[in-house]
């Protein structure tokens, strides 16, 4: 007779404790899309990011059938900051994080309404586009040129990016968001790639990890963002020499204790099983890490009652760590989890759908070009 998750939870041994409770995590991500605890209220302006963790988490668990895809797609499109009729707000276009400003619900591609405080946010544009692709949308209502114009307006002279047009912190996180946006839209005109590459290169620290910027401390998250960005650009081996890449590999592989930490002498944290693990995967040496210790650590942070993962054992689970815990397990090919694309941070199924979408755009553009030539002659 098949063993259910409830049966396994009834056990008291360590073997039961380290089971991956897939169905619990499906329900956890469902709740993240429906109702959130009061402590999440401060994240209202970043609601689209929470939706990404939940939707991509369900996709990784092959369980997107539990959500109403069409309704969520309409909601995401309603968060698109569209150009006005005179297109005077192009530098502010992209996706906002939620409807907190009270902008009228508009999931169409019609001209947007001007609002002095309305603008896209680079991380929300990244997660918004990701969610649409995860849900099977063809991005047909995305104003691609406006998104790219808004992205160009966020790049600074040193090659880094701000989050919003008014200015904000600028660091490697937003370079990664920009790289993902350009990759998903299959158009790198949204950034000055040479400047972005220079920023990544200058962020390499004395100990060979990558920092949030030049002269700062190496960090597992920023190392992922820099390496993944270069991989999406197809420039990794042009930017760093073999010797430098070997040094980066060494820095990353030294981050493992049982799970991974992001900086020397810092505690192990679930999310770094993806940040550092995916970097090692991109650098083609993840197979030399200790899978058993990593898996045991991730599962030690699993909430066996409500699902999800926390950053540490005996802590409350949250959407971010739940998602990256699953992605960390995916890198080790855990049963019941789809494969993750280590650079784009979505399932390989979604990345393949995106590749097919790019091909369809290319075919459409070629046909349109051919038709124009035919008309001209």
Swiss-Prot record:
Zn(2+) binds at residues 269, 271, 321. PFTB repeats lie at residues 144-186, 193-234, 245-284, 291-333. InterPro entries: GGTase_I_beta, PGGT1B-like, Prenyltrans, Terpenoid_cyclase/PrenylTrfase. It catalyses: geranylgeranyl diphosphate + L-cysteinyl-[protein] = S-geranylgeranyl-L-cysteinyl-[protein] + diphosphate. One of its GO terms (biological process) is protein geranylgeranylation. Its cofactor is Zn(2+); Mg(2+). Geranylgeranyl diphosphate binds at residues 219-221, 263-266, 272-275. Its EC number is 2.5.1.59. Keywords: Magnesium, Metal-binding, Prenyltransferase, Repeat, Transferase, Zinc. The keyword Hydrolase does not apply. Binds 1 zinc ion per subunit. The keyword Magnesium applies. Catalyzes the transfer of a geranyl-geranyl moiety from geranyl-geranyl pyrophosphate to a cysteine at the fourth position from the C-terminus of proteins having the C-terminal sequence Cys-aliphatic-aliphatic-X. Known substrates include RAC1, RAC2, RAP1A and RAP1B. Belongs to the protein prenyltransferase subunit beta family. This is Geranylgeranyl transferase type-1 subunit beta. The lineage of its organism: Eukaryota, Metazoa, Chordata, Craniata, Vertebrata. The gene is Pggt1b.
């Amino acid at each position: 007779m098949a063993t259910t998750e409830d049966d396994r939870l009834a056990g008291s041994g360590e073997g039961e404790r380290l089971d991956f409770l897939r169905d619990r995590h499906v329900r956890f991500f469902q709740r993240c899309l429906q109702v959130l605890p009061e402590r999440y209220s401060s994240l209202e302006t970043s609601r689209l990011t929470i939706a990404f963790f939940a939707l991509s988490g369900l996709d990784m668990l092959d369980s997107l059938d539990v959500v109403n895809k069409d309704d969520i797609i309409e909601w995401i499109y309603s968060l698109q900051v569209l150009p006005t009729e005179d297109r005077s707000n192009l530098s502010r276009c992209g996706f906002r994080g939620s409807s907190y400003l009270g902008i009228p619900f508009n999931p169409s591609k019609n001209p947007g309404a001007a609002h002095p405080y309305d603008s896209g946010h680079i991380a929300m544009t990244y997660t918004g586009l990701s969610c649409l692709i995860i849900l099977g949308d063809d991005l047909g209502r995305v104003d691609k040129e406006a998104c790219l114009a808004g992205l160009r307006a966020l790049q600074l002279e040193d090659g880094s990016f701000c989050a919003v047009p008014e200015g904000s912190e600028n660091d490697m996180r937003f370079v990664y968001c920009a790289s993902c946006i350009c990759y998903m839209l299959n158009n790198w005109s949204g950034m000055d790639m040479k400047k972005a590459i220079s920023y990544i290169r200058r962020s390499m620290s004395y100990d060979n990890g990558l920092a949030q910027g030049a002269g700062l401390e190496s960090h597992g998250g920023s190392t992922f963002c820099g390496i993944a960005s270069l991989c999406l650009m197809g420039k990794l081996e042009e930017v760093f020499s073999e010797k430098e890449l070997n040094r980066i590999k060494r820095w990353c592989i030294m981050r493992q204790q049982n799970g991974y930490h992001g900086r020397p002498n810092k505690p192990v944290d679930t999310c770094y099983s993806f940040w550092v693990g995916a970097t090692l995967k991109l650098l083609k040496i993840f197979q030399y890490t200790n899978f058993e210790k990593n898996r045991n650590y991730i599962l030690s942070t699993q909430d066996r009652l409500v699902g999800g993962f926390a950053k540490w054992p005996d802590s409350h689970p949250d959407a971010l760590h739940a998602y990256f815990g699953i992605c960390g397990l995916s890198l080790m090919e855990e049963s019941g989890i789809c494969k993750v694309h280590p650079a784009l941070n979505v399932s390989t199924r979604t990345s393949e759908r995106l590749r097919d979408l790019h091909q369809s755009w290319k075919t459409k553009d070629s046909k349109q070009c051919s038709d124009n030539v035919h008309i001209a002659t």
